Amino acid sequence: MRGAVQVFIMLLLATVSDCAVITGACERDVQCGAGTCCAISLWLRGLRLCTPLGREGEECHPGSHKIPFFRKRQHHTCPCSPSLLCSRFPDGRYRCSQDLKNVNF
């Protein structure tokens, strides 16, 4: 009987609530903290989230390097951290790296 009551309460809560609380949602970079940017979510279409700046080896977009960017960012990745640059690798992908001379291919 107790299990049936718990299931009933769970079903009631699921049908009553039709929204979710998402923390870190943003529209522009200025709404995010230091070391982050407002990037498009990979999972939820139309949602932008405060995302950490790219670390070494992470994918980046070569045209997305300005922080803060005052319009809506059009990429799912943030620019690289200040000490890194967005470099094209032999596989055709762009990644954050320290220096092209020191990259091991």
From Swiss-Prot:
GO terms for molecular function: growth factor activity. InterPro entries: Prokineticin, Prokineticin_domain. Residues 1-19 form the signal peptide. Keywords: Angiogenesis, Disulfide bond, Growth factor, Mitogen, Secreted, Signal. Disulfide bonds join C26-C38, C32-C50, C37-C78, C60-C86, C80-C96. Gene3D superfamilies: Lipase, subunit A. It is found in: Secreted. It comes from the Eukaryota. GO terms for biological process: angiogenesis; cell population proliferation; endothelial cell proliferation; positive regulation of cell division; positive regulation of MAPK cascade; positive regulation of vascular endothelial cell proliferation; regulation of angiogenesis; vascular endothelial cell proliferation. One of its GO terms (cellular component) is extracellular region. The keyword Signal applies. Potently contracts gastrointestinal (GI) smooth muscle. Induces proliferation, migration and fenestration (the formation of membrane discontinuities) in capillary endothelial cells derived from endocrine glands. Has little or no effect on a variety of other endothelial and non-endothelial cell types. Induces proliferation and differentiation, but not migration, of enteric neural crest cells. Directly influences neuroblastoma progression by promoting the proliferation and migration of neuroblastoma cells. Positively regulates PTGS2 expression and prostaglandin synthesis. Belongs to the AVIT (prokineticin) family. This is Prokineticin-1. It comes from Rattus norvegicus.
